[in-house]
């Protein structure tokens, strides 16, 4: 039995921040044809983390509803550099960097999307053909005043920080992608709102029906404060080992867990609502977090590896009598392990930290560490000294 437009819309709105506009989306859905859904990414790094997958999951949802899914790799725009959310000019990448990163992107992408039903395109195919005349026509669609309405540009202009001309051009190039593809819908994070709306306006100028712009929240990272980012060290890469992924998911706060369920889980909303009710009724949130960790690991590895990671976690943590409650600390920037142990109150001095490690009394996530003279690793881990001293520490 076919779903009603209302039911489909309710499903598509899950986890969404804004739709520009919902009326346009309803009208397109009523056309009863496969819509052309666009998601673009500049491959600025070789690996995808869970934060990137929020919009990819939404793309998968459209794919499962029978729509035409286009994943656009910005091999041209990646060499320009997206200024979205940046306080300084992003350094451009070489074409070799972009193409190398694009290959690993595709491999990781198809852990979520059906490769046989996904069209992968490169925007150099049409942007290289623009030429000088085409670029001048494109830039004539927008004014500097309109560009300065954008928050990140406005802040930099107000603070007398430089804005390069090519950064003004970037949103126009991304918008032109939508014209070239005749996109019906474009997906992006909330930091992409301006760029997506430029696409709508350029399509109107090209006498196309404007795309619907759907924005999704940025996933909060392991620290529970800032968006997931490699530079902040609060991320989980989709290629990380199952045991590492499991431990990191289990380290997030109980409050953050529900946001992750909403943005990362494929479970029906009714099931998530029931899990929340179970926790409110007294169920240990750790057990619900285990379900989330296993779901994520199954997606990027396998169900068997998820089961092994769970057992590994139980053996290292629960059987090792690591408590659920412990002091939590957060340090910014580089910090030596010995200093970290001292600042977290696990030892009285750095010399005691060194001595305890040499005697086998220091553990990080259950693993013995015999040398604490190195710097602490970025991320959130459980640090233990002796049998009874524990602290959950985030270094970012």
Swiss-Prot record:
Catalyzes the attachment of tyrosine to tRNA(Tyr) in a two-step reaction: tyrosine is first activated by ATP to form Tyr-AMP and then transferred to the acceptor end of tRNA(Tyr). CDD domains: S4 (cd00165), TyrRS_core (cd00805). It is found in: Cytoplasm. The keyword Endoplasmic reticulum does not apply. Its main location: cytoplasm. Keywords: Aminoacyl-tRNA synthetase, ATP-binding, Cytoplasm, Ligase, Nucleotide-binding, Protein biosynthesis, RNA-binding. ATP binds at residue 230. Belongs to the class-I aminoacyl-tRNA synthetase family. TyrS type 2 subfamily. The keyword Manganese does not apply. HAMAP family: Tyr_tRNA_synth_type2. A motif ('KMSKS' region) lies at residues 227-231. Its EC number is 6.1.1.1. PROSITE patterns: AA_TRNA_LIGASE_I (PS00178), S4 (PS50889). It holds the Pfam family tRNA-synt_1b. Homodimer. InterPro entries: aa-tRNA-synth_I_CS, aa-tRNA-synth_Ic, Rossmann-like_a/b/a_fold, S4_RNA-bd, S4_RNA-bd_sf, Tyr-tRNA-ligase, Tyr-tRNA-ligase_bac-type, Tyr-tRNA-ligase_bac_2. Residues 335-395 form the S4 RNA-binding domain. It comes from the Bacteria. A motif ('HIGH' region) lies at residues 43-52. One of its GO terms (molecular function) is RNA binding. This is Tyrosine--tRNA ligase. GO terms for biological process: tyrosyl-tRNA aminoacylation.
